[in-house]
Design a protein with these regions (language model features):
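ABC family nucleotide-binding domain
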Residues: 2-211
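Conserved beta-strand-loop-alpha-helix hinge in the C-terminal portion
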Residues: 215-233
C-alpha cells in the first residue's frame, strides 16, 4: 500500500436545491517523501482534496488512507487529533499571530504536539536565523511565509499540505519558498503536497496529479524532477 491513497472518493455539497459534486470518484496514490503537485483550474476540486487529506472535511464515499489508517472512518475526535498531530498546513495567507515574534509563532507547535522540533533550528533551516525576534509586521511577505512553513514543519507532521503557497508572493520570493518545500522533501523526507493552478510548477514535482471538473484526469510521474533553482515560470 502507498503512503497516501484516495480510493473512489466523492464529496458533495447541497446549495439550495442543487447538489454540487466537488470530488467525483477521485483515485490516486502518493509515496512517502514525495513532493506532489495537484494541478487544476479554479473549481477543479483540488482544494477539496486538500481539505479531505487534512481532515478538515469528510468525504461522502470512498477511502482515504494515510500511513496505513483510513481517516475516512475517523470520528470527529480522531480527526481533530489527526489534524493536530499528523498534518502541517501552509496557506496562501500566512495567519501569523501579530503580537508574537517569529520564534514564538513557531513555538506554538510545541503547544500542539509533544515531539515538536526546535523552533530556532527550524527557522534556521528556512533561512531566518537572523529574524527570530522580529514580529510579523517587521518581516517581508516572503519571510512571513517562511515563518508559516517553519511553524507547520515544527510539528514534525506526516504530511505537509500547501494551498497556493506562493500565490501572494513575487516571482523571486515564490521561488525561495518553493525551494524550501522541495528541500523539505528531498533532505528531510517530508511528504509535501502543493495545490496550485500554475502548470509551470509541474516539473519540480515527483508526481503531478491533474484535476478537472472534480475528477483526477491524469497522474504523471517525473523520473527526474527539476531543481527549483533552474525553473522559469
Amino acid at each position: 500500500m502507498a503512503y497516501i491513497e484516495m480510493k473512489h472518493c466523492y464529496k458533495r455539497y447541497q446549495v439550495g436545491d442543487t447538489e454540487i459534486v466537488a470530488n467525483r470518484d477521485v483515485n490516486f496514490e502518493i509515496e512517502k517523501g514525495e513532493l506532489v503537485i495537484i494541478l487544476g483550474a479554479s473549481g477543479a476540486g483540488k482544494s477539496t482534496v486538500l481539505n479531505l487529506l487534512g481532515g478538515m472535511d469528510t468525504n461522502d464515499e470512498g477511502e482515504i488512507w494515510i500511513d496505513g489508517a483510513n481517516i475516512a472512518d475517523y470520528s470527529s475526535h480522531q480527526r481533530t487529533n489527526y489534524r493536530r498531530n499528523d498534518v502541517g498546513f501552509v496557506f496562501q495567507f500566512y495567519n501569523l499571530v501579530s503580537n508574537l515574534t517569529a520564534k514564538e509563532n513557531v513555538e506554538l507547535a510545541s503547544e500542539i504536539v509533544t515531539d515538536a522540533l526546535n523552533p530556532e533550528q527550524v527557522l534556521t533551516d528556512v533561512g531566518l536565523a537572523h529574524r527570530l525576534n522580529n514580529f510579523p509586521a517587521q518581516l517581508s511577505g516572503g519571510e512571513q511565509q517562511r515563518v508559516s512553513i517553519a511553524r507547520a514543519v515544527a510539528k514534525n507532521p506526516k504530511i505537509l499540505l500547501c494551498d497556493e503557497p506562493t500565490g501572494a508572493l513575487d516571482y523571486q520570493t515564490g521561488k525561495q519558498v518553493l525551494k524550501i518545500l522541495q528541500d523539505m522533501s528531498r533532505q528531510k523526507g517530508a511528504t509535501v503536497i502543493i495545490v496550485t493552478h500554475n502548470s509551470s510548477l509541474a516539473p519540480i514535482a515527483d508526481r503531478v496529479i491533474h484535476m478537472h471538473d472534480a475528477s483526477v484526469k491524469d497522474v504523471v510521474i517525473n523520473q527526474h524532477p527539476q531543481d527549483i533553482d533552474s525553473l522559469e515560470y
